[in-house]
């Protein structure tokens, strides 16, 4: 029996890479229904046909709702009878959010508030929200909007009993081969015979697979306390290492062209800030950051400061385990997307 036996799970932004990974893992189980909520009817239609072909007996458990997290009414309309929500809807492209920051605010901040408001009103038992390492010490509009999203999540968690609705947040780094990520772009550049373009060779980034992203959300679902932020102890690599790993698999010696840092990018990313590390709880492969449960009684703040602090300091993509080219290639070869692309290239 699965953890979602006879339950209805709703995924906002569900036609994306994360939603596809959840469907692949849980659709053919004893889950009652997986509800996909998103804006794009074409992507919904593509997903419908894909799973009808891939899992014909289980595909009927997917229900599609067209709507926008910015529109509270459409969110509420999709929420009836939902037990759990994975909130993945977001604007996540750093450059576009730099040029249209208010669009990022509308989706990532107001949209999240709408999802949580509707979930609480509908009696949803648990909401797990997906955030990003760019929310820690943000320097760009996307990261800033996600940082505000996290504040909304923590604030909402204080207003509702966790027995009624548990609200948690997961924060993770780059998900390899997810929609809009760099590896599929590089593979397309290799196919076209063009140099692959990298921003800055020494830039470091956390890397994880889609399966690991789902694992993190499931860990939060099963182990998180309302108001928590949970992160995985992910490894990292330099952009140059990642580029050499990809070209080594697809086209050894292929040209790598440095184009410089884009709008809003940092040299390294942070999964846990120094302040969060002070009270983070080590859970093996994960860290749990509990929210501050104190209220607005400021006298209490002066009396009850941080009485217990960890020695753990900032957890970032420079001080985590840094993988070499061979180690990154091993992670890449574990991905079905990479194996399929390599097979197609071999059969050309």
Give short role names for the model-derived ranges.
Residues 3, 151, 155-348:
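Strand-loop microenvironment adjacent to phosphate/nucleotide-handling motifs in alpha/beta enzyme folds
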Residues 8-29:
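N-terminal Rossmann NAD(P)H-binding glycine-rich loop of SDR-like oxidoreductase domains
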Residues 12, 79-88, 129:
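Rossmann-fold scaffold of SDR-type NAD(P)-dependent oxidoreductases
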Residues 30-43:
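Conserved glycine-rich Rossmann-like NAD(P)H-binding loop of the short-chain dehydrogenase/reductase
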Residues 38, 65-66, 106, 200, ...:
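Conserved residues in the N-terminal Rossmann fold of short-chain dehydrogenase/reductase
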Residues 63-84:
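Conserved Rossmann-fold cofactor-binding substructure of NAD(P)-dependent oxidoreductases
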Residues 64, 104, 167-170:
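Hydrophobic/aromatic anchor residues within beta-strands of the central parallel beta-sheet
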Residues 87, 91-147, 151, 155:
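Conserved Rossmann-fold NAD(P)-dependent oxidoreductase catalytic core, especially the SDR/UDP-sugar
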């Amino acid at each position: 029996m699965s953890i979602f036996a006879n339950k209805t799970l709703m995924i906002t932004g569900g036609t994306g890479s994360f939603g596809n990974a959840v469907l692949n893992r849980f659709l053919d189980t004893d889950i009652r229904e997986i509800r996909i909520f998103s804006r794009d009817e074409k992507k919904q239609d593509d997903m419908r046909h894909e799973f009808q072909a891939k899992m014909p007996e289980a595909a009927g458990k997917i229900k599609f709702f067209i709507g926008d997290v910015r529109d509270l009414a459409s969110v509420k309309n999709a929420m009836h009878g939902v037990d759990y929500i994975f909130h993945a809807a977001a604007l996540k492209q750093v450059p576009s959010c730099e040029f249209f920051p208010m669009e990022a605010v509308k989706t990532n901040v107001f949209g999240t508030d709408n999802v949580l408001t509707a979930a609480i009103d509908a009696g949803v038992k648990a909401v797990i929200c997906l955030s990003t390492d760019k929310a820690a010490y943000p320097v760009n509009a996307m990261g800033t909007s996600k940082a505000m999203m996290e504040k909304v999540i923590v604030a909402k968690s204080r207003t509702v009993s966790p027995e009624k609705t548990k609200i948690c947040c997961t924060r993770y780094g780059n998900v390899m081969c997810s929609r809009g990520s760099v590896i599929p772009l590089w593979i397309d550049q290799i196919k076209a015979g063009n140099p692959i373009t990298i921003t800055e060779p020494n830039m470091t980034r956390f890397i994880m697979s889609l399966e690991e992203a789902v694992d993190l959300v499931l860990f939060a679902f099963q182990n998180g306390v309302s108001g928590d932020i949970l992160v995985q102890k992910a490894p990292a690599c330099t952009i140059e290492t990642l580029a050499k790993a990809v070209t080594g698999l697809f086209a050894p010696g292929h040209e790598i062209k440095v184009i410089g840092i884009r709008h809003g990018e940092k040299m390294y990313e942070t999964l846990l800030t120094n302040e969060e590390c002070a009270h983070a709880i080590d859970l093996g492969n994960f860290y749990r950051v509990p929210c501050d449960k104190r209220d607005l009684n400021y006298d209490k703040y002066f009396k009850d400061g941080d009485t217990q602090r960890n020695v753990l300091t900032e957890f970032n993509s420079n001080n985590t385990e840094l993988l070499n080219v061979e180690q990154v290639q091993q992670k890449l070869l574990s991905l079905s997307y990479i194996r399929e692309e390599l097979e197609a290239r071999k059969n050309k």
